[in-house]
Each structure stands twice: as C-alpha cells, then as structure tokens.
Amino acid sequence: RFNELIPCRTAFIDAHTPGSDQKENYTIIGAGVSESPDQHVHLSKTPGFNIGAAAQPAGCTNSLHSHRTAEVFIIHSGKWRFFWGLYGDKGEVVLDPGDVISLPTHMFRGFENITELNESNPNGYGFMFAVLGGNDSGGGVLWAPQVIEAAQAHGLVLLENGLLIDTHNGESIPDG
C-alpha cells in the first residue's frame, strides 16, 4: 500500500550535497539501485524488473547519473524537469502527473522537482515511480564526475564495490 512505503534519505552518494539532500528513495519491488545499507526493500523477489520511487520537495535535484539498465519514470504528483548530458546541458523536458518518460542506458540524466508551492502543498512535494529493467539492477548507478567530487566534499565516498562510506558519520575508508 502507498501509505506503507518506507523511504530512504541516504540512498545515494549525493545525500549530503546541498540541493540534493532532501531526496527520498523507495524500493518497492526488487532492490533497485540504492547504494545505502539503510534502504528498506519492500519486496525483495523481483520478476525481471524493479519498481521504485523518488520523492522530494520543490527545488531538490537528483544529480546527474546513468544506468546500465533501462529506466522509465511515471509521474504521480508534482512537476518535474528532466535534463541530460554529462553536464545536464544537452536537453530537457518538463513532465506533469500522468506523464511517462523512458531514458536510455548509458546517458547521464538528472531531474528536479519544480512544483509550485501553494497552500495545499507548501513544500511542493512531488512523487514519481521508477521502473528499472532486469533482475540485477543493484549497483547500476554511474555518477557524473562532478557529482562524485561534490559528494566527497560533503563526506560521502562511493567505493568500487558500490558501498557508500559516510566519513562525516565516523565511517572510515578501508585500506586497499
């Protein structure tokens, strides 16, 4: 049920980067691509695809990244701007509730919630579902170099094995 979904606010390497630090990630069917051991997986058995979701207040951005698998977003609420290219300058589209976008593999993309604030939604909260192809979607995020640099400046380091280390939280980078 929708009201039983449990978000993870530390799912990705940009969880401490200002402007991206208010994201919520949901893994509904399958483990998805979260980099955090704190991510709650609602149904771990996946039937050949993963369904997740992203939610965030207006002004919050999901940093530029790409995937090894196909990705489809279905807008549930809010107004979202999707942008692509290594620096996010190769194109963009704005989507509303009910709109669907399919993004190809190996293309850097990001998205921002651009919902207008109003009395019924004072923080401009938006929500969208994400569908990832394949049973092995875990660890399938490739971050743009500038995203990795910004994350390190805010204490998050992504190891080669996909483990996220939070140096501001007292975690240390293993030797080797």
How would you name each of these model-derived features?
Residues G32-Q39, N50-H67:
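Conserved short histidine dyad/triad with adjacent acidic residue
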Residues Q39-S44, N62-H67, W84, E92-V94, ...:
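Short histidine-centered beta-strand/loop micro-motifs
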Residues C60-S63, R81, G98-I101, T105-G110, ...:
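Histidine-centered metal-chelating micro-motifs
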Residues I74, L86-H106:
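Short acidic-glycine-tyrosine-enriched beta hairpin
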Residues F108-G176:
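Double-stranded beta-helix
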